A protein has these predicted regions:
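Hydrophobic, membrane-facing alpha-helical anchors
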Residues: 1-5, 48-65, 111-126
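A generic, well-ordered mixed alpha/beta core segment in the N-terminal half of proteins
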Residues: 89-124
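Membrane helical hairpin/interfacial module
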Residues: 31-102
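Sequence-level detector for tyrosine residue identity
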Residues: 44, 118, 133-135
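Juxtamembrane helix-loop boundaries in multi-pass membrane proteins
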Residues: 2-27, 62-89, 105-108, 124-150
Length: 154
């Protein structure tokens, strides 16, 4: 792989998935409220960003996993799986009743649970957790379960 592309992918921060998680539902909302054009722009942009992030995971896997050793990054990482769940709603609008949409949604749920397990195993259980060690972003990891029922129409 080209070093320039690999360096570009390494530079993409994991928390960018939070931006994707905001863009996709906003696009779906705008579309449902009659603003199809701008809604689709948000959704397609989010889809493009998540595809680029998937490339980051594939081609810089070791670096991505190393970043998860940071408790703040690890607690924000589940926004990726939440964004995947919302992307499956957008894809269901584009390609109704396709098995790939359900497969993506279920895969995102499994990955979300895996990231939760990883976060608990690496950042909570091995250390004595004090209030100074807890960051507000930790709640993202566990509140993300709420995205499952909100996207379950897929």
């Amino acid at each position: 792989m080209n070093n320039t592309l690999k360096n570009f992918l390494k530079a993409i921060p994991i928390p960018i998935c939070g931006l994707i998680l905001g863009m996709e539902p906003l696009g779906n909302l705008l579309f449902s409220e009659g603003f199809e054009g701008i809604g689709n722009i948000f959704c397609y942009t989010g889809l493009l960003m998540i595809l680029v992030f998937l490339l980051k995971i594939v081609f810089t896997f070791k670096d991505t996993m190393a970043a998860l050793r940071n408790p703040i990054i690890a607690s924000v990482a589940p926004t990726f799986t939440m964004a995947l769940m919302v992307v499956s709603v957008f894809l269901d609008r584009l390609f109704p009743n396709q098995i790939m949409n359900n497969a993506l949604w279920v895969t995102a749920i499994i990955l979300h649970l895996a990231l939760m397990g990883y976060f608990i195993a690496v950042h909570i259980l091995p250390v004595e957790v004090t209030l100074e060690y807890v960051y507000p972003s930790w709640f993202i990891t566990f509140v993300g379960i709420g995205v499952i029922p909100n996207t379950s129409t897929v």
